[in-house]
């Protein structure tokens, strides 16, 4: 099989790299930052942690499929999925909500 370079280590790139590796390719992932995950990051300041990426997993079936097809244990064995309803709430300065 071929040698493949994946540029970036965001969620989509890592999923592609995993699928390519399972298919038998030699995959190297290149990321310019010190961590992987793309927009899924966390930073700490003054003792508080801030998540900078998505807090929701809108299509869990896609991730379940990725775990199955890359030979991992089921997604739910690694991550606790909790139904969120509503997924967002917008409160304005005057107290009204949308």
Give short role names for the model-derived ranges.
Residues 2-98:
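N-terminal glycine-rich phosphate/pyrophosphate-binding loop and immediately adjacent elements
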